[in-house]
A protein has these predicted regions:
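Short alpha-helical Gxxx[C/S/T] motif in the catalytic ATP-binding
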Residues: 220, 225, 229
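Primarily the dimerization/phosphotransfer
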Residues: 15-60, 79
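Short conserved segment of the HATPase_c
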Residues: 196-208
Length: 270
């Protein structure tokens, strides 16, 4: 009888601990979603307000060419940020079975345009963005260029956001032959920024996850970037490796299979 009582007590304690863990998980998930919605509300309003403000200034000063150009650039930067945010949300909520795009595109053009946006972001933050290597055997590929932009922009964007004025971000792109006509694109991004703790790295690819949750807004984001990166890399059969330490920067290495194409890229929509 004593042994049965002890077994029963052990089961009750184990069950109680399991319940406590489930409550902790549910509470953490609820807090993360609350933070996400609060940050999203701010991050959506901020670029919209910037765009509206810049358009109003342009309307009042149409003859001031320098001011108009400056306002246009700021409005375009805010619009790109808003579009990237919307794309991230749509990507996370897209069914995995949804067909992936198979559009001919020029990889060099896509990378240069993406890097142009990242350079503007880096300049604004006082961070030096350097392209150390851009070695491509092919110009044209078949696929969805948006996914490549999202992967690279989210990783480079985080490297800039969590850096400091005077810091640096170095990235490289190198294509290599694989098998059966498929090539591999290796993308490496390293920085000397804040880095990530071992604890955070265990769940850094979860949606809403942030090392510093109080760093929302245009500089800190809402914790979707790395979740989007992991989803896109996995969907395309790629790999991602991370080497980071708190206060010592971060190094990302992404390898993606790529299909070369002889077809001409489609013209961009106006």
């Amino acid at each position: 009888m004593v042994r049965l009582g002890q077994d029963r007590k052990r089961r009750e304690l184990a069950y109680q601990k399991q319940l406590e863990k489930e409550v902790e998980r549910a509470t953490a998930a609820d807090q993360a979603k609350t933070h996400f919605l609060r940050s999203m509300s701010h991050d959506i309003r901020t670029p919209i307000n910037i765009i509206m403000g810049m358009l109003e200034i342009i309307g009042r000063n149409p003859e001031d060419v320098t001011l108009v150009q400056s306002c246009r650039e700021k409005a375009q930067t805010a619009a790109r940020y808003l579009l990237a945010l919307v794309n991230d949300v749509l990507t996370l909520n897209r069914p995995k079975r949804e067909a992936l795009g198979k559009t001919p595109y020029c990889l060099t053009s896509e990378l240069h345009e993406m890097l142009g946006i990242s350079h503007a972001q880096a300049e604004s933050a006082g961070v030096a963005l350097m392209v150390m290597d851009l070695t491509l055997e092919h110009e044209r590929f078949t696929g969805d260029p948006l996914y490549l932009r999202q992967i690279c922009q989210n990783i480079i964007g985080n490297a800039i956001k969590y850096n400091h004025p005077g810091g640096w971000v170095r990235c490289s792109f190198r294509e290599s032959r694989y098998a059966d006509g498929v090539c591999r694109l290796e993308f490496i991004c390293e920085d000397n920024g804040a880095g990530m703790s071992e604890t955070f790295q265990r769940h850094m690819f979860e949606a809403f996850a942030q090392e510093n949750s109080d760093r929302g807004s245009l500089s800190g984001g809402v914790g979707l970037g790395l979740a989007v990166v992991k989803k896109l890399v996995d969907e395309r059969g790629g790999t991602i490796q991370v080497d980071s330490a708190r206060g010592q920067g971060t190094r990302f290495r992404v390898v993606l299979p790529m299909m070369p194409s002889e077809a001409e890229p489609e013209a961009a929509l106006p």
